[in-house]
Amino acid sequence: MSKTHRIEKDSMGEVRVPADALYGAQTQRAVENFPISGRRFGRRFIEALGRLKEAAAETNVELGLLTPERGAAIAAASREVAEGGWDDHFPLDIYQTGSGTSTNMNANEVIAALANRAATGAAHVHANDHVNYGQSSNDIIPTAIHVSCRAALSGELIPALGHLRDALAEKARDFDGIVKSGRTHLMDATPVRLGQEFGGYARQATLGMGRVERAGEELAEVALGGTATGTGINAHPEFAGRTMARVAATYGIEFREAEDHFEAQGAKDACVSLAGALNTVAASLMKIADDVRWLASGPTSGISEIQLPAVQPGSSIMPGKVNPVMCEALMMVCARVMGNATTVTIGGQRGNFELNVMMPVMADALLESITLLANAATVFADRCIAGITARPERARELLERNPSIATALNARIGYDKATIVAKKAANEGRSVREVVEEMGLIDADELDDALDVRQMTEPGVPGSG
């Protein structure tokens, strides 16, 4: 043994492990086998794994399967891991064994080492025999995925979407009196209110919250208790139920043992469902960010019906240019989340027989998507939406030149004549009002009601009383 390394042994023989590492031989083998991406499991996942190991130790003491001293040492060490004190000792790449066995053993070895610092020799803690008692990587890792994702949804994403919804709803109220051109196919359409557009965006955020909440409910069922293949071999029949009750109390979130362990371990459909919900949220936010970007385009040659807050200089060569950077950042986040949804979908297909074998990458993709969406939604609300101002004069200018206003005349002069008016107005660069007056199609005293653009933004026939 050198000053920098020590020798550890496992079933395959001796391994050189860094002298100051809490982990042992199995983790070191994985370090050497998988130097692939440098991406490690994040805080949420390690916390979940620690909480599960803590609860498992307490349950095993309660069931008489671990001595109180040994169980207390394991629980205390697991708590330290959950609280983030030893994250540097979780070095493994997410691209590893598809069951996550390497990371489970990483946790077992670290927790055993910490527990042995506190326990007496008579209560020596073994990574497999004691820390992992009643568990398999095949049930503890999928359970950690569900716990970490459910916690991230309730603690990060759902509040962030609510914050964005509130910011959008406030703008919907502020802008409700501003009538502007609607647009379909990127072409001028009948009038809408700017507040209606922002109200639609707020509704998208609200529906997105509901979608991820419902998807999160599917994660309440966990695989713990199924052990290796779903049969529950080597686990006390009450182990999973009692353990998950403890975890639920810690997080303040419901968790329960799966109704069918073969589904819970052989398939990851709940994860695929969550990825789909996150993908839908990403599609919604992409649409909102892109609309806001277009509405602010200009300032002289675009739509320019709203103005975004200037948060940084936009160009290294063009003086005074300000770009919609918050929109662009959000759109890139959405692109990443959409890619992650594909990753999770493919991963979900690899549940061969009794075990899914792409769980680490699925866990990473889901947790990354949740955090990215939460952070991006928050900064988009605070640094973009909250500071948007309307340009009602510009909206009025464009609306007056909009030939689709002629739609309001259908009930009075018929579709064919209204089409002639719209084309003439567009071709000659004139307003619909001017063309109608020139053609004498509607009495002058009725024209104001017929072309009341505010009425056009509500159900009914404009000017019909």
Language model regions located:
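Conserved, well-structured ligand/cofactor-binding cores
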Residues: M1-G465
